Amino acid sequence: MNVTLVEINIKPERVDEFLDVFRANHEGAIQEPGNLRFDVLQDPRVKTRFFIYEAYKDEEAVMAHKKTPHYLACVDKLEALMSEPRKKRCFVGLMPE
């Protein structure tokens, strides 16, 4: 299992727009055959900080996700909404199998 944790910091005045843009990516991602989980989380202390927890069955599924129209549209719109570049960490999921 391939897991990615992405931190996204959004300009305060663009949070609602971010949620609209990212909702389309989320809804598309959870329909992908290789997707196991795709959670959008908001930091309760910093309302402009979001974390995306993505789990895919393998690297092939991750690469397929990055070619989907919903992902490409999201990335295209995201740049203008962010207050700083995204931070990404990749993991190998061990449990559950």
UniProtKB/Swiss-Prot annotation:
The protein, known as: (4S)-4-hydroxy-5-phosphonooxypentane-2,3-dione isomerase
Catalytic reaction annotation: (2S)-2-hydroxy-3,4-dioxopentyl phosphate = 3-hydroxy-2,4-dioxopentyl phosphate
PANTHER family to which the protein is assigned, alphabetical: (4S)-4-HYDROXY-5-PHOSPHONOOXYPENTANE-2,3-DIONE ISOMERASE (PTHR33336:SF1), QUINOL MONOOXYGENASE YGIN-RELATED (PTHR33336)
Function: Involved in the degradation of phospho-AI-2, thereby terminating induction of the lsr operon and closing the AI-2 signaling cycle. Catalyzes the conversion of (4S)-4-hydroxy-5-phosphonooxypentane-2,3-dione (P-DPD) to 3-hydroxy-5-phosphonooxypentane-2,4-dione (P-HPD).
Coiled-coil ranges (or none): none
Subunit-level organization: Homodimer.
Residue spans crossing the bilayer: none
E.C. no: 5.3.1.32
GO molecular function, one term: oxidoreductase activity
Cellular component terms per the entry's GO annotation: cytosol
